[in-house]
């Protein structure tokens, strides 16, 4: 895969996450019932960063959980008829909370749908909202993020690659060609 372009550097990522933090606080009139849930792998450090930015605004940090939806995905090969869920505990209570799912890139919407199914299995949230660092289009399901860092129209042959310090040792977003 060859890199076509760098679309976000470290400062652009920070600015987008700060804006998303402000939008979450504003839309929910504070963070009283807000819980952030990062979708592994890169959604988790993004959720933690957003929580830190929210704490600068509100004076306290919202709870942050993590969700591994690989066992819930409907588009995985079906080697097993029903995958076994080893652990459903995401580390935070979602009942009657405003759950903000955080992920790096939204594409078809299938990952988000699977994440919503997993959250609902854990309890009945007051609402589920979606924060994405990058929206690349090409949705296959009627899912739209509430908070978007950057809209990047892509072709289906392109890949958006988010790299974060916590996972990859660098902060940037690039477009690569398959």
UniProtKB/Swiss-Prot annotation:
- Its transmembrane ranges are none
Q: Does the keyword Signal apply?
A: no
- Where can the motif PRPP-binding be found? 99-111
EC number in record? 2.4.2.9
Q: Which InterPro entries match?
A: PRibTrfase_dom, PRTase-like, PyrR, PyrR_bifunctional
- In its UniProt entry, what is this protein called? Bifunctional protein PyrR
Family membership:
Belongs to the purine/pyrimidine phosphoribosyltransferase family. PyrR subfamily.
GO molecular function annotations of the record: RNA binding; uracil phosphoribosyltransferase activity
Q: Which UniProt keywords are given for this protein, alphabetically ordered?
A: Glycosyltransferase, RNA-binding, Transcription, Transcription regulation, Transcription termination, Transferase
Q: What is this protein's gene name?
A: pyrR
Q: Which HAMAP family would you find in this protein's record? A: PyrR (MF_01219)
Residues that hold substrate according to the record: 41-42, 103-111, 136
> Tell me, what does this protein do in biology?
Regulates transcriptional attenuation of the pyrimidine nucleotide (pyr) operon by binding in a uridine-dependent manner to specific sites on pyr mRNA. This disrupts an antiterminator hairpin in the RNA and favors formation of a downstream transcription terminator, leading to a reduced expression of downstream genes. Also displays a weak uracil phosphoribosyltransferase activity which is not physiologically significant.
Q: Name one GO biological process term.
A: DNA-templated transcription termination
How is this protein organized at the quaternary level? Homodimer and homohexamer; in equilibrium.
PANTHER family given for it?
Answer: BIFUNCTIONAL PROTEIN PYRR
Q: Which organism is it from?
A: Caldanaerobacter subterraneus subsp. tengcongensis (strain DSM 15242 / JCM 11007 / NBRC 100824 / MB4)
The enzyme's main class, written as a single word, is transferase
Source domain of life is: Bacteria
